[in-house]
């Protein structure tokens, strides 16, 4: 049976994961139904503030859900050969208005972040 162990990541390690990965899983709450979508993102660190920039079409379930509930969670993985680093981000999302037919920028302001490095041993 495989054995799983992990160690907590510090802030610098978590930021390295966010810089090294390019895909996040964005979790939203659509009423009583969870809704998760993969999204590309861009990291911005401004002083002590961490922001994640996402781009989305202006119409659709994702933007409609964000307009009703701005609290989000993102899960970002950075796999390696012997381990996998994972960062969970909790925050609030804001979206701008777009011109018709244009993409909307969604900015997630990070309120809480945690990270782990997972090691799996096959026994």
Segments and roles (model prediction):
Residues 117-123:
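Short, charged, intrinsically disordered terminal tails
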Residues 31, 95, 119:
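Short, electropositive, low-hydrophobicity segments enriched in small/polar residues
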Residues 58-104, 110-112:
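Short, structured beta-strand-loop surface elements
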Residues 1-19:
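Extreme N-terminal tail/first-helix region
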Residues 21-57:
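Short beta-strand segments
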Residues 25, 49-53, 73, 107, ...:
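General beta-strand recognition
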Residues 19-21, 34, 86, 101:
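Short solvent-exposed loop/turn micro-motifs enriched in small/polar/acidic residues
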